[in-house]
Amino acid sequence: MTMTDPIADMLTRLRNANQAYHDAVSMPYSKLKQGVADILKQEGYITSYDVTEPAEGEVGKTLTITLKYGRNRERSIAGVRRISKPGLRVYAKHTGLPKVLGGLGVAIISTSQGLLTDRQANQKGVGGEVLAYVW
């Protein structure tokens, strides 16, 4: 069965695994999902991610994300929200890039220069599609 919105599926898997205090979560691989995982890692929301090749008899690579928790199992991801959806795309110019929780969170932007955070896109002076907010 095909997936209508793979990024929403990824964010939902992350949110659910985080709420259940799982150590890791696996999902089907795509370059876009790897880019989102890379941003989450560089911003400190996850520990790491790993791309595994399919075993014999399986189809497609798998992306495994290792979640990050504090000393007393405090969640590093308080919330995740999908902004631009297949039925309603949301774009922003570099002058109108959103601030998530006054700069405490991060907006993931798909630009002509690849996936960037709202801060990186603002520094480079590029706008794009606002994929998600993470805080």
Swiss-Prot record:
Transmembrane segments: none annotated. The keyword rRNA-binding applies. Keywords: Ribonucleoprotein, Ribosomal protein, RNA-binding, rRNA-binding. InterPro entries: Ribosomal_uS8, Ribosomal_uS8_sf. GO terms for biological process: translation. GO terms for cellular component: ribonucleoprotein complex; ribosome. GO terms for molecular function: rRNA binding; structural constituent of ribosome. HAMAP family: Ribosomal_uS8_B (MF_01302_B). One of the primary rRNA binding proteins, it binds directly to 16S rRNA central domain where it helps coordinate assembly of the platform of the 30S subunit. NCBIfam families: PRK00136.1 (NF001109). Part of the 30S ribosomal subunit. Contacts proteins S5 and S12. Belongs to the universal ribosomal protein uS8 family. This is Small ribosomal subunit protein uS8. The lineage of its organism: Bacteria, Bacillati, Actinomycetota, Actinomycetes, Propionibacteriales.
